[in-house]
């Protein structure tokens, strides 16, 4: 066994993996109230609620384009820096490691390689040599489509996005320029989507004994001086996925509750019909993307535009070629002591803002009947008090109960906060035993963009029509 002393030192460590790999983000109290704002064309209700998000993952996203610490076989210290995806690399003399790559067509003798002293440069060089051989000998007959993965979330806070996409997402988030203030005020709805296009994965053989990864020159004292202990044990990067990833920001000022469904259709490439609510939402959506990988420059690209560029962005990196090289986009780690895959548990509280808009409407009355008519129209107007509780204020049309003759027309504007709309219309028959006859009576009418109630006919045969226009 290589380096028995170091081997015994690592095997003797006793620690709680779950405790070491758990990160608790923001903690907030649920002290939020509803509020309503009457705008010129609509009544907007803003509701904020405490939400919690937890993730358990062994697949860690890479958002830095040139991180020399993240290569297969790298030894990382388990501490706060690892939880923040800004790991501390243990740089000591290393023993050889065996690597494999999962590109199709490779003969068994070509699918693995050994690196004598693993480091970022030596591993990268060896992998690049193998990739060059694959492109030359196998790439022409083996068309490699990217393995597509995606995940999405409606953005409410940076802590929420870091739990979802990785602790170092803030770097990418800054490039996306996420306007959280507009989200919290209800002015915008924003969704973040992460597309991963995996070209190939480089893995290292499982470590049989912890001491096998070190040269004999490395001592227990060397590890102790670098802070390695049961409180700060070691993991090694067991695999790295290479490819291309795209972070999309979809931003709209629409207040519709169909926004998430419209974005889902966009992501899945569903054809959206014209003259639909989804089409209106997407036409009112701005797109910003941060692209990592798939470009010989090896840098991050930021592009902006409309939704019609989303499909092009995805198709652009859909296949692995020499012109579309892969960058590290995610990695997994295993504990050096026992090869158990490291699973990170992250959680946070955040404030979800839900906005519901109620358009103003009009109630049109048209009376052309050969009789005297009376109208009784009432409704409630919704508001919220300082505790966020609903307050319903009774309202009535100022011409209720008046005798109105033909031809009478009027339009009653109704604000978006109108609830419990009731309309009763009666006509004078002239009959002693039934002086007034009800022509129309409905309660709890929904507020629509335009409702026209027309009455006509004679005293004994009154007619009525209730026509709704709500496009």
UniProtKB/Swiss-Prot annotation:
Sequence motif Cholesterol binding, residues:
459-460
Which keywords fit this entry according to its UniProt record?
A: Cell wall, Cytolysis, Hemolysis, Host cell membrane, Host membrane, Lipid-binding, Membrane, Secreted, Toxin, Transmembrane, Transmembrane beta strand, Virulence
Q: How does it sit in the membrane?
A: Multi-pass membrane protein
* Keyword presence, Membrane: yes
Q: Which parts of the sequence form the motif Conserved undecapeptide?
A: 427-437
* Compartmental location: Secreted; Secreted, Cell wall; Host cell membrane
Span-the-membrane segments of this chain are 158-171, 178-187, 256-265, 273-285
Full protein name? Pneumolysin
Q: Which organism is it from?
A: Streptococcus pneumoniae serotype 4 (strain ATCC BAA-334 / TIGR4)
Q: What is the lineage of its organism?
A: Bacteria, Bacillati, Bacillota, Bacilli, Lactobacillales
Gene of origin?
ply
């Amino acid at each position: 066994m290589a380096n028995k002393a170091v081997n015994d030192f690592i095997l003797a460590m006793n620690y709680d993996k779950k405790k070491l790999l758990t990160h608790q983000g923001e903690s907030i109290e649920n002290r939020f109230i509803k509020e309503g704002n009457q705008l010129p064309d609509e009544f907007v209700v803003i509701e904020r609620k405490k939400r919690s998000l937890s993730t358990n993952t062994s697949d860690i996203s890479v958002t830095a384009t040139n991180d020399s610490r993240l290569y297969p076989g790298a030894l990382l210290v388990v501490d706060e820096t690892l939880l923040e995806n800004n790991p501390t690399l243990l740089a000591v003399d290393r023993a050889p490691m065996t690597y494999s790559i999962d590109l199709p067509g490779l003969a068994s003798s070509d699918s693995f390689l050994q690196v004598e002293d693993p480091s970022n440069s030596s591993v990268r060089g060896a992998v690049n040599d193998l990739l060059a051989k694959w492109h030359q000998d196998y790439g022409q007959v083996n068309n490699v489509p990217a393995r597509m993965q995606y995940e999405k979330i409606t953005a409410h806070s940076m802590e929420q996005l870091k739990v979802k996409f990785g602790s170092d997402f803030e770097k990418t988030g800054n490039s996306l320029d996420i306007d959280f203030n507009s989200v919290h005020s209800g002015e915008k709805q924003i969704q973040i989507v992460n597309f991963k296009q995996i070209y190939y994965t480089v893995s290292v053989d499982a470590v049989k004994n912890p001491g096998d990864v070190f040269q004999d020159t490395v001592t227990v004292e060397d590890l102790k001086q670098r802070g390695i202990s049961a409180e700060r044990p070691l993991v090694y990067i067991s695999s790295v996925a290479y490819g291309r990833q795209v972070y999309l920001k979809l931003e709209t000022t629409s207040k519709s509750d169909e926004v998430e469904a419209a974005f889902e259709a966009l992501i899945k490439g569903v054809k959206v019909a014209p003259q639909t609510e989804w089409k209106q939402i997407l036409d009112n959506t701005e797109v910003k993307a941060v692209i990592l990988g798939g470009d010989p420059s090896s840098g991050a690209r930021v592009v902006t535009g409309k939704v019609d560029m989303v499909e092009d962005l995805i198709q652009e990196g859909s296949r692995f070629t020499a012109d579309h090289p892969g960058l590290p986009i995610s990695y997994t780690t295993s504990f050096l002591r026992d090869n158990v895959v490291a699973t990170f548990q992250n959680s946070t509280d955040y404030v979800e803002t839900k906005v519901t808009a109620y358009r103003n409407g009009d109630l049109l009355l048209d009376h052309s009947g050969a009789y005297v008519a009376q109208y009784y129209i009432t409704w409630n107007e919704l508001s919220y008090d300082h505790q966020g509780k609903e307050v319903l204020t009774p309202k009535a049309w100022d011409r209720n109960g008046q005798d109105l003759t033909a031809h009478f027309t009027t339009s009653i504007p109704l604000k978006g906060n109108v609830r419990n709309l009731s309309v009763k219309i009666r006509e004078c028959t002239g009959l002693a035993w039934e002086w007034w006859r009800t022509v129309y009576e409905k309660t709890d009418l929904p507020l629509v963009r335009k409702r026209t109630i027309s009455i006509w006919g004679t005293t004994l045969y009154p007619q009525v029509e209730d026509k709704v226009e709500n496009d």
